[in-house]
């Protein structure tokens, strides 16, 4: 995924929430995405852990 992509994010105890990627940072353990959400318009960071399906919080919107 890249900046300006529309995504959904997994949050605790609720449905996936729509957002837009503001920044991307790659790490050896996975990728951090700064995502703008309705109640966090300046963005909040989410981490997608490489190699662990349970550690995927950001997915590209369909």
Curated annotation (Swiss-Prot):
Induction per the UniProt record: Expression is dependent on RpoS.
Record-annotated disulphide pairs: none
InterPro entries xref list: Dextransucrase_DSRB
The family this protein is said to belong to: Belongs to the DsrB family.
NCBIfam families named in the record: PRK10708.1
Protein name: Protein DsrB
Annotated organism of origin: Escherichia coli (strain K12)
């Amino acid at each position: 995924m890249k900046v300006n992509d529309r995504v959904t994010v997994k949050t605790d105890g609720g449905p996936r929430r729509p957002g837009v990627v503001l920044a991307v940072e790659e790490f050896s353990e996975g990728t951090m995405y700064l995502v703008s959400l309705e109640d966090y318009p300046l963005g909040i960071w989410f981490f997608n852990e490489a190699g662990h399906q349970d550690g995927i919080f950001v997915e590209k919107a369909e």
